[in-house]
Curated annotation (Swiss-Prot):
Keyword annotations: 2Fe-2S, Aromatic hydrocarbons catabolism, Electron transport, Iron, Iron-sulfur, Metal-binding, Transport
Name recorded for this polypeptide: Biphenyl dioxygenase system ferredoxin subunit
Domain Rieske: 4-100
Function comment: This protein seems to be a 2Fe-2S ferredoxin.
Keyword Electron transport assigned: yes
Amino acid sequence: MKFTRVCDRRDVPEGEALKVESGGTSVAIFNVDGELFATQDRCTHGDWSLSDGGYLEGDVVECSLHMGKFCVRTGKVKSPPPCEALKIFPIRIEDNDVLVDFEAGYLAP
């Protein structure tokens, strides 16, 4: 696995999201009760940013374009209109550095 430093942990306040990019891949980092999760940033239904204008409630993000919802832990659709899950990305914290493996995005089983 190839992890890339994307931000400082303090850059993502609890209940918020931050968009990060590497090699043309955009990932949203979500802070859920102090735990960080990484998913693709674009909604699978309307190609809309989930980190910019999306609404995070617990571990569910709502797309601001058509109100579809996804679980940020699993990437799974929680409410239509989307029918395709989000890719999730391996993430780890070292000290306060947030690292993401942009090459290992996957769909949860």
